[in-house]
Design a protein with these regions (language model features):
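Protein kinase glycine-rich loop
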Residues: 19-25, 30
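Protein kinase catalytic-loop region centered on the HRD/HxD motif
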Residues: 125-135
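AlphaC helix of the eukaryotic protein kinase fold
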Residues: 48-70
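Conserved short submotifs of the Hanks-type protein kinase catalytic core
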Residues: 86-100, 104
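Activation segment signature within eukaryotic-like protein kinase domains
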Residues: 119-120
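Structural helix C-cap motif within protein kinase domains
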Residues: 210-214
Length: 324
């Protein structure tokens, strides 16, 4: 690993003692640190030297800090502090004890329908809250969603949030946003919106239950063209057991025309909630039975909710165990 701006045991701004290097990305290093004031472990994200030299990247980092710091929701990674150290901007986030959905997908291949619905319900809650506070995430994908050991999801990386006028393909085929999850209108140069976030949620839902994205190719331009021109694939081709109620939600999210998608995340969340309140409908052989036993739902609802929460906990623990 290349040299970083902070060393193990170094103390940033007389408060954050570096414990370990948690990871690194294209823009920043992420450190595990101990807050000497609160006596809690935190994550410190600091821009790379080459990244900090670029004014656009600095602006993005500042926007991420402002956007995320303005949000206080149980399903959003909380920003605790921001500052500058040795000339490099940093932000302090809550430390997430878990793994990204992408990491779990790489190990398990896909999630069960019940697990995926629970995750999507929580994600809709987070995005709905962000939208209500004027923040468009613009980079929703499994890599930016953490699953904690208690089954709670945490949405992070608001690095391009609210960059509503910069959604275009550049000359070097790069995009502001991840092209596999990018709504067709964004690649055509239109502004980001709640509906473009909903499109990305739908793509993520598809990936959770199939283990792959619906459109992929050799270049960003090719993939963007597929989102724009090609018919959305039949989900059951990749997972034949997909219940109609789940497929219907994904198809509505991923309509080419934003007007034909869910008007907001609350509508999508309500559809998912119907499934979670009666998870038997996820199994085709039980759907007819469950239709005639609706009176039992209120009595069994608490048990069912506990079951799908335990399923998520099991998924997180299994993924952690297999990575060791």
């Amino acid at each position: 690993m290349e040299d970083t701006q902070a060393a193990i045991n170094e103390i940033i701004d007389d408060r954050y003692k570096i414990v370990d290097i948690a990871g690194e990305g294209g823009m920043a290093f992420v450190y595990k640190a101990h807050d000497l004031v609160t006596d809690k472990d935190v994550a410190v994200k600091m821009l790379r030297p080459e990244t900090a030299a670029n004014k656009t990247n600095l602006y993005r980092f500042e926007r991420e800090a402002r956007a995320a710091a303005s949000l206080n929701h149980q399903n959003i990674v909380k920003v605790l502090n921001v500052g500058t150290y040795k000339g490099f901007p940093y932000m302090v986030n809550e430390l997430i004890n878990g793994q990204t959905l992408k990491q779990i997908l790489d190990i398990r291949g896909k999630f069960s329908f019940l697990e995926a619905c629970d995750i999507m319900y929580q994600l809709c809650s987070a995005i709905m809250y962000a939208h209500q506070h004027g923040v468009i995430h613009r980079d929703i994908k499994p890599q930016n969603i953490f699953l904690t050991q208690d089954g709670t999801i945490k949405l992070g990386d608001f690095g391009i949030a609210t960059f509503q006028n910069s959604a275009h393909i550049t000359q070097n085929n790069s995009m502001l946003g991840t092209v596999q999850y990018l709504a067709p209108e964004i690649s055509r140069g239109q502004n980001a919106s709640e509906q473009s976030d909903i499109y990305a949620i739908g793509i993520t839902f598809f990936e959770l239950i199939t283990g792959r994205v619906p459109f992929d190719g050799d270049t960003a331009l090719v993939i963007a063209a597929m989102h724009t021109k090609e018919k959305f694939p039949n989900i059951k081709k990749f997972n034949p057991r997909t219940p109609d109620c789940v497929a219907k939600i994904i198809y509505r999210c991923c309509q080419k025309d934003p007007v034909e998608r869910y008007p907001d995340c609350e509508y999508m969340r309500k559809d998912i909630e119907k499934i979670l309140k009666n998870p038997a409908i996820l199994e085709k052989n039980k759907s007819f039975f469950s239709f005639f036993h609706r009176d039992d739902q209120s009595r069994d609802q608490r048990r069912q909710e506990k079951e799908h929460r335990n399923a998520l906990k099991k998924a997180a623990k299994e993924a952690k165990k297999e990575r060791k």
